[in-house]
Amino acid sequence: MKAISLVVVALLVVTSIIIYQRANILIYSMTSTELPQLLDPRDEGEGAVWFDDYYTIHKIDERTFAIGETRYYQLNFNYLILGDSRAVVFDAGTGQRDIGVVVASLTDLPITFIPSHLHYDHIGNDVVFDRTALVDLPHLRVRVENNKLKLTRFEHLGEVEGYPLPELTVSEWLVPNETIELGGRPLTVLYTPGHTQDSISLLDGEAGYLFAGDFLYPGQLYGFLPNSNMGDYLQGSRTIESATGVEVRVFGAHRDDALGVPELR
């Protein structure tokens, strides 16, 4: 009986350690000692143009472009959204290549970079933008000193591919449910947590576009990472449901193996 009790206690201790350290265990299991090799280039189909040997450009309309990292294993897609007076870059990949060069080939408007969330494969890391705007959340605001925000390990997750923790210079705070004006093109900031606590989506109500980041895209969604929460996912889903119509086109930040822009209708 004593032996059984000791085994039960030992199992409880081990289980408690696993639960307490689950985020560290998950990161360790995801960490690679080498950068992932680039995928072979493919014909991306009608409407897609190879910018160089890494980026593809997909024209959604005259003022909206998807910039694909179609040789990166996560198949990231970032979005250039043009107004009359300024433009938004929504996500910037890992920074393995400088997306700014691609953006400069498409517009000379002033650029504001807006990350959908703070994971390493979306913030560009070493890529520098003139202006960076972040969602206005108390747990981010309180950590800012001299407009600088140092990301935390679980916000960034960059160690899985060897990226150091970056520091972002915050030029503008985006209040959830408010509208940012690009000049003849208003975008509504939707707070859509779930994938992370800081996830946002951008809604172009006039065009019927929702840029959803990692909250929603074709393929497997990640609601189990550090900083993820399934209850928050429900909240974010309700926000999108109440803000969008049935005709909205949803553009995500990743795709599965299918060609083209990751879009849901």
Describe the residue ranges of each PLM region:
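Accessory terminal helices/loops
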Residues: 1-50, 235-265
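An N-terminal domain-start capping segment
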Residues: 22-43, 85-106, 153-167
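Conserved beta-strand hairpin/beta-sheet module of binuclear metal-dependent hydrolase folds
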Residues: 53-105, 202-213, 217
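Short, hydrophobic/aromatic-rich segments at coil-to-beta transitions
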Residues: 61-66, 177, 185-188
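Hydrophobic/aromatic beta-strand patches that form the interior of the parallel beta-sheet core
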Residues: 65, 112-114, 133, 172-174, ...
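Short glycine/proline-enriched coil/turn segments at helix->beta-strand junctions
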Residues: 83-85, 106-110, 126-131, 205-207, ...
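Metallo-beta-lactamase
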Residues: 87, 94-95, 179, 186-193, ...
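Active-site HxH/HxHxD metal-binding segment of metal-dependent hydrolases
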Residues: 96-181
